[in-house]
């Protein structure tokens, strides 16, 4: 009897040792000691990037950040990095709070953290680095207000920004200066040969004509010959600028007074428009008036059309206003 009692514990030890040996062999094969196998409840925080993908074991990798819809749409704004913090266990799964800097026109809608289960979609353990965030991007009240305003004036706003963009300001300035220089040349410096002489009721060599011509004097060097020529305006004759403008008004086919007037008007419009803010910009920058004099000979001069500090072309280069936005959601295993 004593021998039988001693033999039973030895017989029980053999199955236990065999089971322990099997566990030691099968454990690593099942991934129990794999450092990539982690309990999701132990994860405190996730930092996710828009240009990176998750790790994968059973399935294909997915983007760490993925927009899946919302009232604003996925093309409206793309956050570069989002951090999600573990806020606790609700009895079913981990709950998350995700934060990032968003434009004030947008906010998070529905958010969910998606992780790859290590063995299956029901596994409490997940693959390390396999978590990503799926989110909706919605408009805030301010964003909806801006959307309605831009919808009413979309055509004019697009045209205004294209016309006064930083790329087009330099070209427009050069073109206007070229037209203005050409108009001045044709108006004052070019001695046209094809235009008929100005009409006068007196013969060109009469005493009346010669008297006024001598009173006007010779034209300045480089100016038109008819710059000071006689012209009948109803009060006798006129000279100087009156004659120059009057002479162009009688049948002259070349550019003259009207081309100069048009070029001046265009230049004035350009200068005036550049001082005005865009009609739908909330953060337009108005440069301060320049000082009355400069303290040094090489100090930067104020230029309303330049590209230096305090100068601008009408373009959307103002920094957009942002604030920290939060989204809340649970977990989905895949």
Swiss-Prot record:
Record-given protein name: Store-operated calcium entry-associated regulatory factor
Keywords: Calcium, Calcium transport, Endoplasmic reticulum, Ion transport, Membrane, Signal, Transmembrane, Transmembrane helix, Transport
Sequence intervals crossing the membrane: 169-189
Cytoplasmic side of membrane: 190-334
A GO cellular component annotation in the UniProt record: endoplasmic reticulum membrane
Recorded name of the encoding gene: Saraf
Principal subcellular localisation of the protein: endoplasmic reticulum
Subunit structure: Interacts with STIM1; the interaction is inhibited by the interaction of STIM1 with EFHB.
Membrane-side (Lumenal) residue stretches: 32-168
Polar residues composition-biased segments: 313-325
Compartments in which it is found: Endoplasmic reticulum membrane
Gene source species: Mus musculus
Similarity comment text for this entry: Belongs to the SARAF family.
Sequence segments annotated as region (Disordered): 198-219, 310-334
Gene Ontology terms: biological process: calcium ion transport; regulation of store-operated calcium entry
Lineage of the species this protein comes from: Eukaryota, Metazoa, Chordata, Craniata, Vertebrata
Membrane topology: Single-pass type I membrane protein
